[in-house]
């Protein structure tokens, strides 16, 4: 027996095949492009997702004989995208993606609507789904009038696989149409966004069966028996499943292009005023909260570009011993900031530069600035009652031991480095497929990876970094006043 996890990413699709005991058999990848017709626009043609999935499945069939005994499939997808279908289930226009910011006016108006934050549990960001539909209504009324169904990217692949309109709660929580606490579509939120319940897909939990694979696809892929399609998940919930972040206090730190701090919750405790995301998890009776900073390794890669070095060269030059906070302060807002400021206009800055400032000082400042930005997210977690004592560190930035020592100390949280292997969204999706087929309890399947190293905070530097963090916090409003003196 085997299970297939699909990670429908922004730049490509990854298909991961696992055995009946959860061991990775192999994976294949396919890439596709986004279109950016105007500044702030980001779109994709859903037919490219379908083609990528079909090519990946056919390659898996050729490479792995276990694929013929496939029992279940699950899709994890990039969240918030608006795929619009007409009454014939034809795609009306390209999907508007999560990183499309055209609906900023509609997002602000919707966010200011009474009850929206309370019901949805979140600020309405421009990248969320509901403001995109209001933008279509205001700017493409002929397309809005044709909308029969709105599907998120993962739900669109669910439709392709099963012929049914079905989505899971973790993905749907990022639409601003779902009551995150009730785990169901909200009539009030739909009404606020000029949408109807019949335009929404049926909801299931991510680890529950959503349907079965279409017979024609099964025949094309060389599968003789019935295949279950699980509800699936949004990409971050799937990543949490892949790394075993299921119960209260479980969490991970992702040091990628952006920085993500995610913690599982056993209840729904929204804190929208802090720009902290509160979403349904992919398993019943679980939620998760997530703080996002927009420029984590992006900040280091920017410095590497302007100094004509590699990121590894910059961090390697610092050595292995964690140093006290430097005099140079960096605000890592190269593309604005999400948590806790929800400020798309703010930009980064250095302060404290002198004639004696050297390259290593800039590197330390960038690493410290990112660590302080993550501390901002951690502070919002504390305000909502989330207790985090340790985090699993993943992503490209986690390869820097110096950076992990720094972050552990700034956060005063132990960081665990996992053994090399697969524990991302594709694995999480495959695990959800396995649960949907076997009925196993999620805790028996959503296991944590083996930990090869635990990095503890440097107790002797806690006070110094706490003091530096307070300066970092005070810098944001002052720099914003300089950059936007009119308060715009």
Language-model segments: which ranges?
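Generic detector of well-ordered alpha-helical packing
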Residues: 8, 46, 87, 101, ...
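Short beta-strand-loop/turn "lid" adjacent to the catalytic site in phosphate-handling enzymes
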Residues: 61-98, 122-127, 154, 158-179, ...
């Amino acid at each position: 027996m085997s299970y297939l996890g699909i990670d429908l990413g922004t730049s490509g699709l990854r298909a991961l095949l696992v055995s009946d005991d959860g061991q990775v058999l192999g994976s294949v990848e396919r890439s596709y492009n986004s279109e950016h017709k105007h500044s702030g626009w980001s779109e994709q043609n859903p037919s490219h997702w379908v083609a990528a999935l079909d090519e990946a499945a056919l390659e898996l069939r050729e490479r792995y004989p276990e694929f013929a005994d496939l029992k279940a499939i699950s899709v994890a997808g990039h969240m918030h995208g608006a795929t619009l279908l007409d009454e014939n289930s034809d795609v009306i226009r390209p999907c508007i993606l999560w990183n499309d910011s055209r609906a900023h006016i509609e997002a602000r108006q919707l966010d200011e609507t009474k009850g929206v934050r309370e019901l949805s549990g979140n600020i309405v960001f421009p990248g969320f789904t509901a403001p995109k539909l209001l933008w279509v209504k205001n700017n493409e009324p002929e397309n809005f009038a044709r909308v029969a169904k709105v599907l998120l990217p993962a739900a669109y692949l669910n439709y392709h696989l099963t012929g049914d309109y079905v989505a899971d709660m973790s993905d749907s929580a990022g639409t601003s149409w779902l009551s995150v606490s009730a785990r169901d579509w909200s009539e009030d939120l739909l009404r606020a966004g000029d949408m109807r319940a019949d335009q929404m897909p049926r909801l299931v939990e991510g680890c529950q069966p959503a349907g079965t694979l279409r017979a024609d696809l099964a025949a094309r892929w060389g599968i003789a028996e019935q295949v279950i399609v699980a509800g699936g998940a949004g990409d971050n919930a799937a990543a949490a499943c892949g790394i075993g972040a299921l119960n209260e206090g479980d969490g991970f730190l992702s040091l990628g292009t952006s920085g993500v701090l995610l913690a599982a919750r056993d209840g729904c405790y929204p804190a929208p005023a802090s720009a902290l995301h509160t979403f349904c998890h992919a398993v019943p009776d679980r939620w998760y909260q997530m703080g996002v900073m927009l420029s984590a390794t992006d900040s280091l890669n920017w410095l590497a570009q302007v100094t004509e070095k590699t990121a590894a060269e910059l961090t390697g030059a610092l050595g292995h011993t964690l140093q006290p906070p430097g005099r140079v302060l960096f605000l890592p807002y190269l593309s604005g900031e999400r948590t806790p400021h929800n400020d798309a206009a703010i930009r980064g800055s250095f302060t404290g530069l002198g004639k004696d400032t050297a390259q290593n000082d800039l590197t330390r400042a960038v690493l410290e600035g990112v660590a302080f930005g993550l501390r901002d997210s951690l502070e919002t977690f504390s305000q909502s009652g989330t207790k985090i004592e340790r985090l699993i560190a993943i992503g490209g930035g986690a390869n820097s031991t110096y950076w992990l020592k720094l972050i552990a100390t700034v956060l005063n949280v132990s960081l665990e480095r996992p053994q090399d292997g697969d524990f991302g969204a594709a694995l999480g999706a495959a695990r959800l497929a396995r649960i949907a087929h076997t009925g196993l309890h999620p805790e028996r399947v959503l296991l944590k990876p083996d930990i090869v190293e635990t990095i503890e905070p440097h107790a002797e530097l806690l006070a110094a970094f706490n003091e530096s963090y307070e300066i970092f916090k005070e810098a944001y409003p002052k720099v914003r006043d300089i950059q936007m003196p009119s308060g715009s």
